[in-house]
Every structure is written in C-alpha cells, then in structure tokens.
From Swiss-Prot:
EC number: 1.3.5.2
Single GO term (MF): dihydroorotate dehydrogenase (quinone) activity
The protein's name in its UniProt record: Dihydroorotate dehydrogenase (quinone)
Organism: Psychromonas ingrahamii (strain DSM 17664 / CCUG 51855 / 37)
Residues annotated as binding FMN: A62, G63, L64, D65, K66, T86, N139, N172, K217, T245, G268, G297, Y318, S319
Signal peptide residue numbers: none
GO cellular component: cytoplasm; plasma membrane
Family from the record: Belongs to the dihydroorotate dehydrogenase family. Type 2 subfamily.
Cofactor note: Binds 1 FMN per subunit.
Known function: Catalyzes the conversion of dihydroorotate to orotate with quinone as electron acceptor.
Protein's gene: pyrD
Binding residue positions for substrate: K66, N111, R112, M113, G114, F115, N172, N177, N246, T247
HAMAP family: DHO_dh_type2 (MF_00225)
InterPro entries reported in the protein's UniProt record: Aldolase_TIM, DHO_dehydrogenase, Dihydroorotate_DH_1_2, Dihydroorotate_DH_2, Dihydroorotate_DH_cat, Dihydroorotate_DH_CS
Quaternary structure (record): Monomer.
Length: 336
C-alpha cells in the first residue's frame, strides 16, 4: 500500500529524476530505524548456483544500483542477491538526457543511459561498507571512450579491481547503448575475451585464495545460430554462469505505445516472452552444465516461474520492481 502511494508521487517525476530521488532516500535510510518503511521478512529458501549459496532465488538486476550505494536497503527488502553496476574503469556521465522513458501502457521502460557511473574505485568503497549478508555480484563494462577492439583491457582492469570484493562478476557485453559493445558477443571477439577473462580469473584465484565465478550477460536479440555459437564458447571456456537477458531493441511488442519510438533498450513486461524464449534455447544447448540467471520482464510470480521452467536457476528483477515495489520480491521468493 505504501509503495502504491509512493509510486504515484514518483511517476509524476521524469523516470531518471524518480530513480535518483529513490536512490538518495534509500541511501539516507538504510541501516537506520527508518528502514522499517521497506524492510520485510522473506522465507529462507537457499539455492546453490555457481558454487555459491544464495539465500533465495530472487536478485536485483544490474542498473538500478549502479554505484552500489544502497546495497543494505535492497538487502532489507529481501533480495537474495544484488548485482551492482554496470561499472567502468573510470567514471563517465553516460548519454545525454532525457535517456529513460516509461511505456506505461505495458509496464515497460526504455533506456539509453550509456553506463553512467562513478567508476570502479567508488563502487568498491561502497561494497566494502555494505553489511549485506547475501550474494553481491559486480557487473563490469567498458568505458565509452575505449575502442571496442581494446575493450578487453577495460574488462580485465575492472576484474582486477573488483575480484576481492565480489561474490561473482558479471561481464556485460550486451548493452545496446554503448556503440559496438554487442559485437563482443560473437565469434573470435567473444572467444578472445572469454579466454583472457579465464586466464585472469585463474591468476586472481591464486593471488586472493578464492574463486570468484564469472557470468556473461547477453542480449535477447540473437538468432538461433548466434545462440548455438555463444553457448559453444561458454562451454569451451568453462564460463561459470549466463545472465539472460539484457534489454531489447525490438519494438514489436510496444508498437503505437508512448515513447515506443525512443532509441535504447526496452525492458519490463514487453520483454518477458522474448527473454524466456532465449533462456529456453540456451538451456537446450548448455544442458545443465552452466547455470542461467533469468532476467527480463518478470513482474509477477507466474513470470518468474516461467523463467525457472525455461531453465533458469535464479531470477532477477528491475523494471517489475519499479512498477510494483518491494512486495514483488516477497511474493516471488515465497511462492516460486
């Protein structure tokens, strides 16, 4: 009920202002007596994925808490894991505003943020200050100014920095808002990146005496042939997990709706069926050897169950959380 009232206020603001206001309030209240506003008990339903024990199967997708400022607040809402980022080696402003739009008719969101973040050092400071007892994933990307051909170096630099503080590392090569980034999903470019990441992972495992799994985050806009090729590479390089999927460039499901013509990635309910279909296709190729984290359009228990049935071991929410609030976390955790 409280969130419904809060939402009516937030939705009077433009989406990015609403986001920034929310982050600011959560940051102020987390760890204080005021966190009763959003703190809730959820059932303990531990699940083992990527060699980690997750308190439950519902996580916060990357992009909502880019700089890791509100980890404890989101933890208080019952998330079993929180994926912060996407973070880049150095701070960058992202694309020009306006860059986030609500597709209200279908509970969708279009964004072209462009990896706006305060840089990896700032994120690490926030992660170190967190008291969250669940799993923290750190989602890494490349800077806008780094040529795609040299993108591998940005990922390795971020990996070096975050490795001691992450429970898992998510490698984002699928945002549609950084020019050329999605080209890293294919062929030799993907194989070179995965090979370099695995070599560095082995070196860092020795250095820190701990193994931090790597999960690759992919786009939903893939042909069947591309899915087969990516799955083959994941298996060949023994990548620890797959996050499926990021936002879509497809607009078929929101034709004629508000802001449908805006450039950027579409998320929320319109993405549900497309992302679930991609998960099912990857599951058929990976045959249980690599776990899948399902994300895209989950805004109710049924949608979450569909992701699990398609082959996901965990689910993440973002847009559904914007539209439905913390109660969505509790509903899914307790009923999935």
């Amino acid at each position: 009920m409280f969130y419904q009232i809060m939402r009516s206020f937030l939705f009077m603001l433009n989406p990015e202002k609403a986001h920034d206001f929310s982050i600011k309030q959560l940051k102020l209240t987390q760890g204080t007596a005021l966190d009763f506003i959003y703190r809730q008990r959820v059932q303990q339903r531990p699940v083992q994925v990527m060699g980690l024990t997750f308190p439950n199967s519902v996580g916060l997708a990357a992009g909502l808490d880019k700089n890791g400022e509100c980890i404890d607040a989101f933890g208080a809402m019952g998330f079993g894991h929180i994926e912060v980022g996407t973070v880049t080696p150095v701070a960058q402003p992202g694309n020009e505003s306006p860059r986030m739009f609500r597709v209200l008719e279908s509970d969708g969101i279009i964004n072209r943020m462009g990896f706006n973040n305060e840089g990896v050092e700032n994120l690490i400071k926030n992660v170190k200050e967190s008291n969250f007892k669940g799993v923290i994933g750190i989602n890494i990307g490349k800077n806008f100014s780094t040529p795609v051909e040299q993108g591998k170096e940005d990922y390795l630099l971020c990996m070096d920095k975050v490795y001691p503080y992450a429970d898992y590392i998510a490698v984002n090569i699928s945002s549609p808002n950084t020019p050329g980034l999605r080209s890293l999903q294919y062929g030799d470019a993907l194989n070179e990146l995965l090979a370099a990441l695995k070599i560095r992972q082995a070196e860092l495992q020795v250095k820190y005496n701990k193994y931090v799994p790597i999960a690759l985050k992919i786009a939903p806009d893939l042909s069947d042939q591309e899915i087969v090729s990516i799955a083959k590479s994941l298996l060949e390089y023994k990548i620890d997990g797959l996050i499926a999927t990021n936002t879509t460039l497809d607009r078929d499901m929101v034709k004629g709706m508000s802001h449908a013509g805006e450039a950027g990635g579409l998320s929320g309910r319109p993405l549900q069926n497309k992302s679930t279909a991609v998960i099912a296709k990857f599951a058929a190729q990976l045959k249980g050897e690599i776990p899948i984290i399902g994300v895209g359009g989950i805004d109710n228990v049924i949608a979450a169950k569909e992701k699990i049935q398609a082959g996901a071991s965990l689910v993440q929410i973002y847009s559904g959380f914007i539209y439905h609030g913390p109660q969505l976390v509790k509903n899914i955790v307790n009923n999935i």
